[in-house]
Amino acid sequence: MENTLIKSIYRDTPAYLNQELQISGWVRTLRVSKSFGFIEINDGSFFKGIQVVFEEDLNNFEEIAKVATGSSLIIKGLLVESPGAKQPFELKAQSIMIEGACSGDYPLQKKRHSFEYLRTIAHLRPRTNTFAAVFRVRSLVAYAIHKFFQDKGFVYIHTPIITGSDAEGAGEMFRVTTLDLDALPRTEEGRIDYAKDFFGKETNLTVSGQLNAETYCMAFRNVYTFGPTFRAENSNTARHAAEFWMIEPEIAFADLQDDMELAEEMMKYLISYVLEHAPEEMAFFNEFVDKTLFDRLDNIVNSDFGRLTYTEAIEILQKEKERFEFPVEWGADLQTEHERFLTEQIFKKPVFVVDYPKDIKAFYMRLNDDQKTVAAMDLLVPGVGEIIGGSQREERLDYLEKRMAELGLHKEDYSWYLDLRKYGGTRHAGYGLGFERVIMYLTGISNIRDVVAFPRTVKNADF
């Protein structure tokens, strides 16, 4: 007999009622009396499990009555309407086979475990309700990202993980080397001789696929990259991880306004997609993780996102500067408390802040006519602050070369990037969206370590 997925039973119950079925899955809970027992089984196909009823006429009743939480079972039985109010149906077991017994020291017992504890058993935490919901939503959002861009005709570009350039100009990168660390080759000046390394030069793990994506934007018009990125920031906060995924579209013949319109459309699409395709998981998050979740997401889907310049934002914030821990001054980056005040107290909806001072933004952003600001945008959302950062890219070769010189970037390291401006360059724009930040926002989970399967953070690379 073929296995029937629990998801199929929930989605098309009438087709399975009063039918003999076989299911397989893991024991979540077990309750036994003298002559019968109840097992909650989850098979991984659906957020909810199914109740299995077994009675003393089962040929291995005594064995099943002692089965441990976490054990895997194969069960044949008749699906019937449940007399209890807690579930619409149950499986009356005709046979139960133990596929894999579970040891008595199984860490996941029937009680609430803290997120901190569950991080220490990251290989087992997907078996809990919370993390089953988190990672199913993560899977759905990943699919929705591809669907959104593919339906709009974007081309998906696989950008390299190993790179010889720093896309952000920040320098906080993980080094890639095959050199013997106990006997490093040196140049005459005493520096490490990377000419003897695997690639013949200094290489790192990528912090962004943007620069590489721009090359394909100049051929395919609209492209996106979606993959892992790495930041060696010594930042041990709930929002930072050393390894995370980024969504980075690039659009040609486009300016900052086009960039913001794409970002707004994408955010609304992702939220609507998850609410439609993961209703059980989202209801769980709204009830047990963040009771304002549905209201917050509904506000995004049904709002026209606000717009204001960085200068206007500073003027608003300076009128309320006494309430902030960090100072508010033109030329300084906005802190999370500033961002949240703007989006939660002033606009009460998502808002784009545009035209930031050039000195706090990356070299590739287009210089505005005032010569002081660049065509950059950040999307701020209630509850989080900044969630997307983007810009119109500098398409003018002379402006780009001047900006690189100001920042001490070597033209030879970016010659291929400069070529894009020499050979038929166009106006183009793009943005970056941290995938984990989206999952946190969609689920209400407050720590990035709890939306990554095996988080990589400062002093932590377990599993």
UniProtKB/Swiss-Prot annotation:
Organism (species): Desulfitobacterium hafniense (strain Y51)
Protein name per the record: Asparagine--tRNA ligase
CDD domains linked to this entry: AsxRS_core, EcAsnRS_like_N
Entry annotated with the keyword Chaperone: no
Protein keywords: Aminoacyl-tRNA synthetase, ATP-binding, Cytoplasm, Ligase, Nucleotide-binding, Protein biosynthesis
Gene name per UniProt: asnS
A Pfam family per the record: tRNA_anti-codon
PROSITE patterns the record matches: AA_TRNA_LIGASE_II (PS50862)
Compartments in which it is found: Cytoplasm
Transmembrane is among the record's keywords: no
Family affiliation: Belongs to the class-II aminoacyl-tRNA synthetase family.
